[in-house]
């Protein structure tokens, strides 16, 4: 039996936090393996124009940032594996070599330290039957799927920055965009809110929630709305429903292993250290007052440096 190589750092997640962590780890002379179920980039892949990333006055496409981060990580020697982590075991008595074993769907990975950078996933639309229509008109990624609805009618559900960004993008390809928000005003930042001014094909529906997703022949044909103030119902006919109502951390597989807060985020200090020595957190998956690409990148660098210091002390 061939003994598997033990990696210095296994990084779970290849979003901006995970990829940055791998860059800093590899540059520090540590072996780094990044596990990513989907394409490298995380939520960067859903950003058409990243306008608040320092150094790009006109913004930059999220795909471009993701590609550059991956190329940079691989240039310094990080290895990106197409796999999904499903569990992690901690060898409490082993402070050195194989302290952690991360079990993936494809393989298992022994490591001296681990950085969790799995980010957060979109909250599902809380409507019966909506999940079955994902890929059939319901989408959680406007930049991924928006072009399929060129010159058609679409609906965006949500009122935060992500929802507004979706509206702006979709207004350029769709015939009409209906924005549905359960409040009387946007939650989005003032700068984002101003982006809606002057969009001629936008229709807003305030104080409304989606109570049903309508379908014909197995595809979305519209939604039914319920006004939360008056109780009145109405119907919007559309072929696409883009959901942007929030995110939740991908941490169920870590329950009982490491401390999580009441919302499921990994509790971590400024350097990313968690309640388990040698286990670090970076990006949207951790407790933090701000979840942006720029903070995820910073988290990744800090977690890698903290992991390197931990390994040096073992």
Q: Where are the regions a protein language model picked out?
A:
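FAD-site-proximal beta/loop scaffold in flavoenzymes
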Residues: 121, 126, 132-148, 245-295, ...
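A structural signal for the hydrophobic beta-strands that form the central parallel beta-sheet
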Residues: 80, 116, 140, 204-206, ...
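A Rossmann-like FAD-binding core segment of flavoenzymes
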Residues: 73-103, 108-111, 171-269, 309-313
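Beta1-alpha1 glycine-rich phosphate/pyrophosphate-binding loop at the start
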Residues: 3, 7-76, 152, 164-190, ...
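Residue-level detector of alpha-helix initiation sites
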Residues: 15-16, 39, 120-122, 160-162, ...
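Phosphate-coordination loops involved in phosphoryl transfer and adenosine-cofactor binding
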Residues: 6-8, 82-83, 150-152, 207, ...
């Amino acid at each position: 039996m061939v003994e598997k190589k033990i990696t210095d750092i296994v990084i779970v997640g290849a979003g901006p936090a995970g990829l940055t962590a791998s860059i800093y780890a590899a540059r520090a002379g540590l072996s780094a393996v990044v596990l990513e179920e989907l394409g490298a980039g995380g939520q960067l892949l859903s950003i058409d124009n990243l306008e608040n990333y320092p150094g790009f006055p006109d913004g930059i496409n999220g795909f471009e940032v993701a590609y550059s981060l991956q190329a940079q990580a691989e240039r310094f020697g990080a290895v990106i594996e197409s796999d999904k982590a499903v569990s992690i075991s901690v060898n409490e008595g082993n402070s050195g070599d194989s302290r952690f074993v991360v079990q993936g769907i494809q393989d298992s990975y022994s490591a001296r330290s681990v950085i969790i950078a799995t980010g957060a996933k979109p909250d599902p639309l809380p409507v019966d039957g909506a999940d079955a229509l994902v890929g059939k008109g319901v989408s959680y990624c406007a930049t991924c799927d928006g072009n399929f609805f060129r010159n058609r009618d679409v609906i965006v559900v949500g009122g935060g920055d992500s929802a507004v960004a979706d509206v702006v993008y979709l207004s350029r390809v769709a015939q009409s965009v209906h924005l549905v928000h359960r409040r009387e005003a946007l939650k989005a930042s003032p700068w984002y809110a101003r982006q809606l001014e002057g969009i001629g094909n936008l229709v807003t529906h305030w104080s409304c929630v989606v109570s049903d997703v309508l379908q014909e022949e197995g595809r979305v044909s519209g939604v039914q709305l319920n006004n939360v103030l008056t109780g009145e119902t109405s119907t919007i006919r559309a072929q696409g429903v883009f959901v942007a109502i929030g995110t939740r951390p991908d941490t169920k597989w870590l329950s009982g292993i490491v401390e999580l807060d009441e919302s499921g985020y990994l509790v971590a200090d400024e350097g990313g250290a968690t309640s388990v020595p040698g286990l670090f957190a970076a990006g949207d998956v951790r407790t933090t007052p701000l979840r942006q690409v720029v903070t995820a990148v910073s988290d990744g660098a800090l977690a890698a440096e903290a992991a390197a210091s931990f390994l040096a002390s073992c």
